């Protein structure tokens, strides 16, 4: 697949009026193909293999928050990156998830071509599915290169999305605690 992608990048470079055989661009198609495969490796991962049984019994029933998980993803509309951070909170119901698994879940879904709104929902639903928590809240704050580098060219703009499930959606106090912890 890398060879086919590299050939496609070679055609794109030539289509832009550049010489793909000139010194600075000679290896660019291969490098770009490898980069794209890395940036979209989430397609080859599953939630089950990623979590790998790292769900543990716990009597904890208070909110657990993992803040500032760095992420980058590819906008499905322009194939340009969006870069930001994700905050995940959940209310355990007898089980907790290994801490590193939250970052791995974020990475798995972020490393696919999509929009931020869907990414936020995918992360929330995955955490809910794995933990069977009483509630899950996810907030993503990101800057989109498709809006910063082209189109309206607004370099200081950012987008925030949230998904609230269970108690985070139905209980205003729980939602407010989450928002205060994230922004406080």
UniProtKB/Swiss-Prot annotation:
Disulfide bonds: none annotated. The keyword Secreted does not apply. Keywords: GTP-binding, Hydrolase, Metal-binding, Nucleotide-binding, One-carbon metabolism, Zinc. Its EC number is 3.5.4.16. It holds the Pfam family GTP_cyclohydroI. GO terms for molecular function: GTP binding; GTP cyclohydrolase I activity; zinc ion binding. One of its GO terms (biological process) is tetrahydrofolate biosynthetic process. It catalyses: GTP + H2O = 7,8-dihydroneopterin 3'-triphosphate + formate + H(+). It is an enzyme of class 3 (hydrolase). NCBIfam families: folE (TIGR00063), PRK09347.1-2 (NF006825), PRK09347.1-3 (NF006826). This is GTP cyclohydrolase 1. Toroid-shaped homodecamer, composed of two pentamers of five dimers. Zn(2+) binds at residues 75, 78, 146. Pathway: Cofactor biosynthesis; 7,8-dihydroneopterin triphosphate biosynthesis; 7,8-dihydroneopterin triphosphate from GTP: step 1/1. The gene is folE. One of its GO terms (cellular component) is cytoplasm. Belongs to the GTP cyclohydrolase I family.
């Amino acid at each position: 697949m890398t060879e086919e992608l590299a050939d496609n990048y070679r055609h794109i470079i030539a289509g832009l009026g550049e010489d793909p055989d000139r010194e600075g661009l000679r290896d660019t198609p291969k490098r770009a193909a490898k980069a794209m495969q890395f940036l979209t490796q989430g397609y080859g991962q599953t939630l089950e293999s990623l979590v790998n049984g790292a769900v543990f019994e716990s009597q904890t029933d208070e909110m657990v928050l993992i803040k500032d998980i760095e992420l980058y993803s590819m906008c499905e509309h322009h194939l340009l990156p969006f870069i930001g951070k994700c905050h995940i909170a959940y209310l355990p119901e007898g089980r907790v998830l290994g801490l590193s698994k939250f970052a791995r879940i974020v990475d798995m879904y972020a490393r696919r071509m999509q929009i931020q709104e869907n990414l936020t929902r995918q992360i929330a639903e995955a955490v809910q599915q794995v933990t069977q928590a009483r509630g899950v809240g996810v907030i993503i704050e990101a800057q989109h290169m498709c809006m910063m580098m082209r189109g309206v060219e607004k370099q200081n703009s950012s987008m925030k999305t949230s998904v609230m499930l269970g108690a985070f959606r139905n209980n205003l106090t729980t939602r407010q605690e989450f928002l205060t912890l994230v922004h406080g």
